[in-house]
Structures are given as structure tokens and as C-alpha cells.
Amino acid sequence: MEVDDGSRATPPLDAVAAAFKSQVMELQDLVLARSMFPATALPDLANVDALVTAMESQVETISRRLQEELDAIPKAKKLVQRSLKEEEKLQHMLANLPSGMRKNDFANQHEQSSSRMLPHFNSSFTEANECELKIKDEPVAAPRKGRAPAPRWYISTEELDSLSSYMRGRLTLEKVNIAINEVASYADANAHLVTCPKKKLSEDTWEKALELRDIAASGAVKGNHFFLEADIKGPGLKLDNTGKAILTVLRHLGRFHEVRIGHHRVFILSKQA
């Protein structure tokens, strides 16, 4: 048994000795090669070192670029999510847009649809529109060029159906959405008057503009689009029973909230979430 164990232990020792001898011979060959060609070996080694350094630099550059791309992925995902959210909002608006306000109707019967769908404003609204056309030449109005229009957050069929029959009454989707477009037009007209210079307005309109500016500067209204109860004059929304029912529905669905400022009842439009 002992002899057998000794014979089994011998081959591994021989293998280690052979491997050690092989390493020694390789080192000897390398020493000989270096001593035989010293003049050519050093430049070659220098070239190899330069190439390796250049490759390391390229690898570092690639690694840095990859890290930049990885860091940009979360930002790109957020941008895609925002785009999808905006697309949902636009699809919701398009699906619930009153038929009389669609593009084809405007293309075929622009005058008729304009008179049917948009409210007939008084002289102050007309002057506010003229002011907007001229305001580009007015230095004080330059910072407000990018002001967004009043929000038009149309309701959907599902929202209308979710109301109690008592609240819904005889209201239709089209009637309510036409009213939404109309009150947004009131808010746009007020925003124009708030920003329009005095020299562009008549004396009567200027007095109203000053009053609107005081309202716009109040804490509850500041930074938001608004209209007054006094602005409601039709044709799509009037202060009759139907109009009051529409206002109740819009308030219930969160399209606006109202505050009392002085003797005015002020409706502040909500933005779509």
C-alpha cells in the first residue's frame, strides 16, 4: 500500500518540476533574445507601449460615451412619458370637441361656424383683439408674447353620463363643450385687456382693464385665466336656467372654481391635469 502511494505521488511532482524547468528555459530564451537584438528590441517595445496607451485611451473614451448614454436613458424615458401624456390629452380633446368646431366645418363654412360657435363680445373684446394684433410693436408687451391661451378642458361622454339625472337634465355633450369654448374665449379677452397698453384702448375700456388688472393681481387669481359673471352674454352660455345648469356641471367636474372679489363673481379656469 505504501509503495503504491509513493508511485501515485511521483507524477504530480514530476509535472511541477517540468513546468518549473519550462519557465526557466523561457526566461533564458528571453534574456538571450534581449542581449542579441538590443538596438531593435527597445524601439519595438516603445512602439508597442505607445499602441497600448492609445488603445487604453480609446477604451476610456468608449466607456465614457457609454456612461453618458446610460445616464441619458432615464431622461429619455421621462420625455416619452410626457409625450404620451400630452397625446392622451389631445386625443381626449379631439374626441370630445363639439362637431361644430371641427376643422372641416371651419374650412367649408368659416363665417357661419364662427358666428354660430363663438360668443358675440362687446366693443371691449374687439378692441382687445385689435390690441393683440398691434402689441408686437409695443416694447412693454414683449415679455408676454408666449402667454398660453385659456385652457379648454372639454368634458367626455363618460363624465356627462356619470352625473345624476337631476344634475344632467337635458344637457348634451355638445352644449356643455360649446360653453367651455365660450368661457375660455371670455378668459382670453380678459387676458388681452390686462396686458394691453393704455394708448390702445378707449377710455371706457381702459377703466375695465384697470379693474381686471386688480382682479388678476389678487392672490386667488394670479397666474390663472379667469372670466366674470358679467362677461356671460351668450350665445352658447347665458345666465338662464340652462346656463346656470351648465355652470353647475362645470363646477362639479372641476373645470373651474369661483371666488368673490369686490362685487364681482370671478370664475378661475382649471388646467387639465
From Swiss-Prot:
Keyword hit for rRNA-binding: no
Matches recorded under InterPro entries: SKA1, SKA1_MBD_sf
Gene Ontology molecular function: any one: microtubule binding
One Gene Ontology term, aspect cellular component: outer kinetochore
Protein name, UniProt field: SKA complex subunit 1 homolog
Gene Ontology biological process terms, A to Z: attachment of mitotic spindle microtubules to kinetochore; cell division; chromosome segregation; mitotic cell cycle; regulation of microtubule polymerization or depolymerization
Cited Pfam families: SKA1 (PF07160)
Family: Belongs to the SKA1 family.
Keywords, ordered alphabetically: Coiled coil
Covalent S-S links between cysteines: none
Coiled-coil annotated residue ranges, if any: 77-97
